[in-house]
């Protein structure tokens, strides 16, 4: 099974992946992790697309996506989860990640990107108050 968890920075994609992985025992990739597969970036991308395609009906893979450019890597048949959070929650989490300091340019970037996946077609849309049992049920686990 291929599960794509898509969302802005600091919405909880990794936390959700960790919770799901208790049942899935999946290989987890995030963003450009696939570049580690090969020295040549285009060869790495091709290899990663093959891994994702094989995962649709094979070994479990969870792919965490923040950047829209990575959506094109997803094959048909992926179970797509869009994860959202309120802007104030995202800012607080990002501030914590930045050791208590959220520079104004980063804050403006978060504001401009907020809601970028709100209208994206998906199999399951969650906010940060999801119930993991309901999520696993939707996945058929």
Language-model features and meaning:
Residues 2:
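Walker A (P-loop) ATP-phosphate-binding motif of ABC ATPase nucleotide-binding domains
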Residues 5:
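Hydrophobic anchor at the beta1->P-loop junction of P-loop NTPases
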Residues 9:
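The conserved Walker
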Residues 14:
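Walker A/P-loop
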Residues 17-59:
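Conserved substrate/cofactor phosphate-moiety recognition/catalytic segment
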Residues 71-78, 117-121:
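Short loop/helix-cap segments at secondary-structure boundaries that form the rim of catalytic
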Residues 74-97:
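Conserved phosphate-donor/acceptor-positioning beta-strand/loop module used by diverse small-molecule
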Residues 96-141:
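Small-molecule kinase domains that catalyze NTP-dependent phosphoryl transfer to phosphate-bearing small molecules
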């Amino acid at each position: 099974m291929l599960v794509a968890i898509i969302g802005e920075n600091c919405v909880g994609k990794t936390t959700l992946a960790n919770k799901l992985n208790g049942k899935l025992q999946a290989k987890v990739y995030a963003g450009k992790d696939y570049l580690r597969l090969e020295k040549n970036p285009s060869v790495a991308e091709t290899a990663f697309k093959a891994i994702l395609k094989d995962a649709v009906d094979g070994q479990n893979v969870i792919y965490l996506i923040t950047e829209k450019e990575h959506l094109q890597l997803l094959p048909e048949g992926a179970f797509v989860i869009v994860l959202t959070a309120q802007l104030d929650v995202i800012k607080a989490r990002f501030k914590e990640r930045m050791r208590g300091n959220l520079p104004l340019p980063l804050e403006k970037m978060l504001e401009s990107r907020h809601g970028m996946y709100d209208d994206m077609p998906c199999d399951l849309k969650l906010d940060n108050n999801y119930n993991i049992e309901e999520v696993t049920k939707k996945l058929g686990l």
